């Protein structure tokens, strides 16, 4: 998929002309940085990396290169654990960074180092449907109708897929007579309508948008808007369900790697820049919900209000509990998703 059309010239002008991004003045570091990120952040970090490098050079006189690696969040976390030399990680959910921290690569207190539990922007899960919504898919209950083909990635490898699953679980619990048994039955029926599980969100978007597979894509809000912008309002509609989930993609410095590579100052400045006005404005342009009130207000009606549950809802109990119960080997997802059954 091609990049979202965002004016980098405007962004860079604002960055260079405005106040310095935090941490730039004092930082001295090596000339390259690797951000290991999840699937649908490609366009955002392409723009952000170029803007950050330009601002860094203007402030320090040093030319640097910020690179990015993208894939399913769980697979990306595993790659870092297995030796991929990330300076920073910007993943889909806190559990994936906790998994890296558990191997000693990131300090246990990583989530307290930056504001908002180290999540500089938020997102949610929406439905992307064919133009005119021919199957009438308006809420989670519609996804289990006979003959509906649902496109979603694999929760074992994709952070977005885990958010998709949990949003559906929360909706089912809140229905009249809702219970955990009924939520499990609901998701079992939903996943019978999923013909194939891609490993990451971008792969699922490609399957739906470019290959014409499925009737509905369960998508990150920004990914749905990217498809809408790139392929035209005459091809797709975006549906906001009655209930979704507050996704808080977190960021962290990979301590062991930056200390070995001498890139800590650069890596810390890079993540701090995500919270600066320019970083927040760029996040909003790419349909990530900014934390900064001014950036959110400037976005106008770009982000519809909807009811959102959080991962700390008693239904989930935080990421450690949710991961163990739903997504670890032998968890509920393994019972729910049984291809060919």
Give the location of each predicted region.
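N-terminal export signals
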Residues: 10-27
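Bacterial N-terminal signal peptides that target proteins for export
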Residues: 2-10
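Periplasmic-binding protein-like
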Residues: 119-124, 184-191, 198-199, 231-264, ...
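Ligand-binding pocket segment of bilobal, Venus flytrap-like solute-binding proteins
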Residues: 175-242
């Amino acid at each position: 998929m091609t990049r979202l059309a965002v004016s980098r010239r405007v962004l860079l002008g604002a960055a260079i002309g405005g106040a310095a991004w935090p941490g730039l003045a004092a930082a001295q570091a090596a000339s390259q940085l690797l951000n290991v990120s999840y699937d649908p952040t490609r366009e955002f970090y392409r723009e952000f990396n170029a803007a950050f490098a330009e601002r860094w050079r203007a402030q320090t006189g040093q030319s640097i290169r910020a690179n990015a690696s993208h894939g399913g969040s769980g697979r990306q976390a595993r790659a870092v654990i297995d030796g991929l030399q990330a300076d920073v990680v910007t993943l889909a959910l806190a559990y994936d960074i906790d998994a890296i921290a558990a191997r000693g690569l990131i300090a246990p207190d990583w989530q307290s180092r930056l504001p908002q539990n180290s999540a500089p922007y938020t997102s949610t899960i929406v439905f992307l449907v064919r133009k005119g919504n021919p199957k009438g898919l308006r809420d989670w209950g519609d996804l289990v109708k006979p003959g509906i083909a649902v496109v979603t990635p694999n929760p074992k490898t994709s952070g977005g897929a885990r958010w998709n699953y949990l949003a559906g679980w929360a909706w089912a619990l809140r229905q009249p007579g809702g219970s955990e048994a009924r939520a499990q039955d609901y998701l079992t029926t939903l996943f019978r309508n999923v013909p194939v599980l891609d490993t990451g969100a971008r792969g699922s978007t490609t399957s739906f948008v470019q290959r014409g597979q499925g009737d509905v894509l369960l998508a990150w809000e920004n990914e749905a808007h990217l498809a809408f912008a790139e392929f035209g309002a005459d091809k797709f509609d975006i549906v906001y369900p009655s209930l979704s989930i507050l996704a808080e993609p977190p960021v962290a410095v990979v301590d062991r790697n930056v200390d070995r590579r001498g890139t800590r100052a650069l890596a810390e400045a890079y993540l701090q820049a995500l919270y600066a006005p320019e970083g927040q404005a760029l996040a909003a342009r790419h349909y990530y919900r900014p934390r900064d009130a001014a950036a959110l207000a400037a976005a106008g009606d770009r982000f519809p209000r909807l009811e959102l549950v959080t991962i700390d809802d008693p239904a989930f109990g935080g990421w450690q509990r949710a991961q163990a119960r739903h997504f670890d080997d032998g968890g509920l997802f393994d019972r729910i998703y049984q291809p060919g059954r």
